[in-house]
Amino acid sequence: MSGTQRRGGGAGGERRGRDNRRGQNDRNRNQNEYLERVVAINRVAKVVQGGRRFSFTALVVVGDGEGSVGVGYGKAKEVPAAIAKAVEEAKKHFFKVPLVGRTITHPVIGEKAAGVVMLRPASPGTGVIAGGSARAVLECAGVHDVLAKSLGSSNAINVVHATVDALQQLEEPEEVARRRGKSVEDIAPAAMLRARKEADEAAAAARMEEKAGVN
């Protein structure tokens, strides 16, 4: 009798263990929905009575890889804690980036402090032609084809914020057309509109396949 109880308890324990692991995996998947890039980590020394007190700062870029991105800054006594704070701040500052297919909608120049970054749309297959700091922002935002060039300071923090400034200036072709009182066809190149249509059709097909798989 006692042996039967032990087996039953063991099975229940195994089920509970599997449920716990499944729940943990679900939480990990939710946490891993975003792309994270640590751009810079610096050690900061503060002079206090009796010596110096050290802490760390982290600059992190977070995005969903589908048009949303944010930048955060964190400070703590340990590097992991500084990164965690930066990630949370980045998520609070998410903004949407207008995209046409896998590239940006139009050329733009962003500036922040001494940083100046120029972005230009690129044809499919070009890839992200950019330095490390700008690349981190563009990849997290979901830009796959773009030409980027730093025209100012090479400081990673300045480049990141200049890239963000450039992305925040981007507009949808419809917005530009409405402001100028023209049609979208008069504003946007035919290739851009064609790429957008193909991207929309591909996304719609993917949603239908996913829905069919669920059913």
From Swiss-Prot:
Composition-biased stretches (Gly residues): 1-12
Chain ranges of the S5 DRBM domain: 34-97
Region (Disordered): 1-31
Domain of life according to the entry: Bacteria
GO terms classed as biological process: translation
InterPro entries in UniProt: Ribosomal_Su5_D2-typ_SF, Ribosomal_uS5, Ribosomal_uS5_bac-type, Ribosomal_uS5_C, Ribosomal_uS5_N, Ribosomal_uS5_N_CS, Ribsml_uS5_D2-typ_fold_subgr
One Pfam family in the UniProt entry: Ribosomal_S5_C
UniProt keywords, alphabetically: Ribonucleoprotein, Ribosomal protein, RNA-binding, rRNA-binding
Gene Ontology cellular-component annotations: small ribosomal subunit
Transcription regulation found in the keyword field: no
Single GO molecular function: rRNA binding
Compositional bias annotation for Basic and acidic residues: 13-31
Record bears the keyword Methyltransferase: no
PROSITE patterns: RIBOSOMAL_S5, S5_DSRBD
UniProt domain comment: The N-terminal domain interacts with the head of the 30S subunit; the C-terminal domain interacts with the body and contacts protein S4. The interaction surface between S4 and S5 is involved in control of translational fidelity.
Quaternary structure note: Part of the 30S ribosomal subunit. Contacts proteins S4 and S8.
Protein task: With S4 and S12 plays an important role in translational accuracy. Located at the back of the 30S subunit body where it stabilizes the conformation of the head with respect to the body.
The name this protein goes by in its record: Small ribosomal subunit protein uS5
Annotated gene: rpsE
